[in-house]
Amino acid sequence: MKNLLSLCFLMLAAFTLNPAAAQEKQSIFDVSNSSLFSNDDEFLKVDQAFAFNFYQKNNLLEVSFDIAPEYYLYRHQFKFKGKNTQFTSVLLPDGIDHEDEFFGVQKIFTENLAFTVNLENVSNDASIKITYQGCAEKGLCYPPTSKVIKLSKFILGESTSAPSSDAAQQTNEGEVKKSEQHQLSDMLKQDSLLLTLIAFFVGGLLLSFTPCVFPMYPILTGIIVGQGEGLTTKKAFTLSFFYVQGMAITYTLLGVVVAMAGAKFQAVFQHPIVLIGLSILFIFLALSMFGVFNLALPASWQNKLNNVSNKQKGGSITGVLMMGVISGLVASPCTTAPLTGALLYISQTGDVVLGASALYALSLGMGLPLLILGSSGGKLLPKAGAWMNIIKNIFGLLLLAVPVFLLERFIPEVASQALWALLILVSASYFYVANQNHAAAQNVQQGKGFWYGLRSLVIFLMLFFGANLAYQLIYPSSNNVTNNAQHASFKQVTSLAQLEDEVKKANMQGKTVMVDLYADWCIACKEFEKYTFVDADVQKALSNSVWLQIDMTEFDSTDNAELVQHYTILGLPSILFFDLQGNELTKQRTTGFMKAAEFSAHVKSIFK
């Protein structure tokens, strides 16, 4: 059992300490793909995108939609509900096929849509509610919209046409299947609160297996393991439970506040000063795992919290709860698809109570594996012994990975890579010594124990990854040289007036303009610089464009606040494009990370 456990920890360390592995798994949970932070001014309002009209003559209700270019309605999202009337099944046109990234081929309507509803038994105060939902090709999905049509009794020759937009009531019902975040957003709009909470709990459970939650595992396990030999299953469960509650409280409050405050709140808690402070905190926590000092509340505090914490050794319920709050706030800052869905709903409807409940359920789902892992500290782990010091040291190394994870958002890439290489090599060296000592203690001849060999393989892989990172630092590839050279092509702009002046200068030279709004705390901004802007096709597509860049790290500075207000910037990264007349092409604005091929195609479609 001990050998198997040691192998699991070694493999866990080998994976979590590999930044490349974490990068590959961001996929749809990445904040950069979130529609929450897209600029609403890029898109038409729902009634402009899908102009609604109807005409009633006797028992026939003719309904039509004038769909704007680059917008579409989902066929399967149409729903009909009658009040004081009956109607036969509505026969909609077939529509055209549309490839949906997450839900396969869907039928959609573009340009114009018309259909007829056959009414029966229309009584007084009769009405029919038509619910529909559509999206913009640029990446925004509207919430389901409903129009309530007041019907007239069958009077030969009498007809009723569409009322003004004020008369048509809009609600938020139906289902969205454009993307995961919008699907989850609109689940909140269903009648069943229980089903909504279950859906978000499952979403959180799936989310718990992504790199976004990675920092929480070493933090919680470090707290549990740090309790020492006196740890029991009950105490481990209690500590884990309150840690998860702290995390859940954070996500619930964070989601509501972010929905109200937008990217300014995000900027504060991703500020370098905050990240440095938290990195120092986790370094101290790691040192405690190595036995440099013991973490314990002052005696006076312990006495005051005696009734609450049952004199828990090495900490308290309050302390663990606060650690969960901190972990949820900063150590796992990814705005994921489930979280984005809840935020999107809150921002659109203002239903904070329902949104907060869903976020809490999402957090509990995220915390379930954490709860199981933490509770295992008193049940599944072997009994006290020398192995405990090894495990504490392992989690000390994992805790040291958290500061690197936080700092790499604003430190130079070469420094981040050096920290990862150093940490992996030091960890591999430690594991090698521990493996040798374990083999000697078990009287296992070198090269002959199965578990010894398997542990050695894991150590070898760690050494390989660490050495590979170190090699890239010492002998950078030509691509890195290209990256550094390409960054110099940006001209820095600091104010709205300077931006307008630079656009005029570019237009006088017959050039268009691309403006990159970035911040040091913005991961997706760094991805743009590393993967997209250096691409040859992207550079060719923008060869006749002046590249401007605005540092939005201090989001609330006077100059940046003016830019934010003028261009209605809700989140980063945002890429603005200006034509030869100096006009911003608002519908072509890019918000969120785009891969090089996609971005190149986007630029080519703009500047043909």
UniProtKB/Swiss-Prot annotation:
InterPro entries: Cyt_c_assmbl_TM_dom, DsbD_gamma, DsbDN, DsbDN_sf, Thiol_diS_interchange_DbsD, Thioredoxin-like_sf, Thioredoxin_domain. The chain crosses the membrane at residues 194-214, 241-261, 273-293, 314-334, 352-372, 387-407, 414-434, 456-476. Keywords: Cell inner membrane, Cell membrane, Cytochrome c-type biogenesis, Disulfide bond, Electron transport, Membrane, NAD, Oxidoreductase, Redox-active center, Signal, Transmembrane, Transmembrane helix, Transport. It is a multi-pass membrane protein. Disulfide bonds join C135-C141, C212-C334, C522-C525. Residues 161-180 are annotated as: Disordered. Residues 161-173 have a biased composition (Polar residues). Its main location: membrane. It is found in: Cell inner membrane. GO terms for biological process: cell redox homeostasis; cytochrome complex assembly. SUPFAM superfamilies: Thiol:disulfide interchange protein DsbD, N-terminal domain (DsbD-alpha) (SSF74863), Thioredoxin-like (SSF52833). Residues 469-608 form the Thioredoxin domain. One of its GO terms (molecular function) is protein-disulfide reductase [NAD(P)H] activity. Its EC number is 1.8.1.8. Residues 1-22 form the signal peptide. PANTHER family: THIOL:DISULFIDE INTERCHANGE PROTEIN DSBD. Belongs to the thioredoxin family. DsbD subfamily. This is Thiol:disulfide interchange protein DsbD. The gene is dsbD.
